Curated annotation (Swiss-Prot):
Function: Receptor for the hormone galanin, GALP and spexin-1. The activity of this receptor is mediated by G proteins that activate the phospholipase C/protein kinase C pathway (via G(q)) and that inhibit adenylyl cyclase (via G(i)).
One BP annotation, GO: adenylate cyclase-activating G protein-coupled receptor signaling pathway
UniProt keyword annotation of Disulfide bond present: yes
Disulfide links within the chain: 97-174
Gene: Galr2
Protein name: Galanin receptor type 2
Organism: Mus musculus
Superkingdom of the source species: Eukaryota
Length: 371
């Protein structure tokens, strides 16, 4: 949890006196829903990608890494954040006080950097489908993932000393141990490197991708099928970009207001803090939902896993049926190498199918200094 948010929560709880606080019940329920949907959904994403060694393309490796970061974020952040609204004391000890916040920021940065890498991968795949093949290899993707986690460790390392357990009045709390100027500088760095810069990269790459898709005209396959494919890719890009920006913008705007503006500690601002937490945390659980809605290959993978689980169930549970769509169900990847979106090759030669913008890419999350 961010230092300013921590103080705000303490002050707000003191305002409530000893009366019943609705957030003590409602907020943990929302967190429980986010936890269940996020844990199950992201675990399912990993299962679909790992089933039969399907994560072999660069995009699938990035999506796999994003799922790992999202799942770790859900497991390491949500349960502890929920206890803030139900327990007066920090009951998990000094070691977890430091470790939990370190893991939170580690997964935040890993998620945001992965999203930026996915956007670059998609831009190269769409804009330079032939020339980027030598660059977009699984080996290079694994190297990029290693770099992502290395940078995440670098930027999250200071949080091992940022928080500490201490006594406040008669309460045991886990709160920032740094001075206000150091916290302000650290929170500003977190905003810049884990939100602002990734958003700029996402905006630039997706804008250029959209521009290329919108302006490129296929003289042969310019019929309704090509237009439908173009609209589908455009819609997917807009969805993932808007989700990321909308889910995290309120939280970071609030943090900036706390440090650089006027943000009085009232019940209304406390409610805004809670809302910003819920919206930002929800981004990690809606990603698998977006995958399922947009990617038919993910849906096929989900059905295949569902069918496999039901086959292992006792026969007396035969009333629970997992219906498979007709056709070939062998596809388990979130992104196949083939696509119905046809592009003009870079050399004004014959038309070649271009790697598709992934039907499974979405923008997570990434970062929450208020955790």
């Amino acid at each position: 949890m961010n230092g300013s948010d921590s103080q705000g929560a303490e002050d707000s709880s003191q305002e409530g006196g000893g009366g019943w606080q609705p957030e003590a019940v409602l907020v943990p329920l929302f967190f429980a829903l986010i936890f269940l949907v996020g844990a199950v959904g992201n675990a399912l994403v990993l299962a679909v990608l790992l089933r039969g060694g399907q994560a072999v393309s660069t995009t699938n490796l990035f999506i796999l890494n994003l799922g790992v970061a999202d799942l770790c974020f859900i497991l390491c952040c949500v349960p502890f954040q929920a206890t803030i609204y139900t327990l007066d004391d920090w009951v998990f000890g000094s070691l977890l006080c430091k470790a939990v916040h370190f893991l939170i920021f580690l997964t935040m940065h890993a998620s945001s950097f992965t999203l930026a890498a996915v956007s670059l991968d998609r831009y190269l795949a769409i804009r330079y489908p032939l020339h980027s093949r030598e660059l977009r290899t699984p080996r290079n993707a694994l190297a990029a993932i290693g770099l992502i986690w290395g940078l995440a460790l670098l930027f999250s390392g200071p949080y091992l000393s940022y928080y500490s357990q201490s006594q406040l009045a008669n309460l045991t709390v886990c709160h920032p141990a740094w001075s206000a100027p150091r916290r302000r500088a650290m929170d500003l760095c977190t905003f810049v490197f884990s939100y602002l810069l990734p958003v700029l990269v996402l905006s630039l790459t997706y804008a250029r991708t959209l521009h290329y898709l919108w302006r490129t005209v296929d003289p042969v396959a310019a019929g309704s099928g090509s237009q439908r494919a173009k609209r589908k890719v455009t819609r997917m890009i807009v969805i993932v970009a808007v989700l990321f920006c909308l889910c995290w913008m309120p939280h970071h705007a609030l943090i900036l207001c706390v440090w650089f503006g006027r943000f009085p500690l009232t019940r209304a601002t406390y409610a805004l803090r809670i809302l910003s937490h819920l919206v930002s945390y929800a981004n990690s659980c809606v990603n698998p939902i977006v995958y399922a809605l947009v990617s038919k290959h993910f849906r096929k993978g989900f059905r295949k896993i569902c069918a496999g689980l039901l086959r292992r169930a006792p026969r007396r549970a035969s009333g629970r049926v997992c219906i498979l769509a007709p056709g070939n169900h062998s596809g388990g990847m979130l992104e196949p190498e083939s696509t119905d979106l046809t592009q003009v090759s870079e050399a004004a030669g014959p038309l070649v199918p271009a790697p598709a913008l992934p039907n499974c890419t979405t923008l997570s999350r990434t970062l929450d200094p208020a955790c």
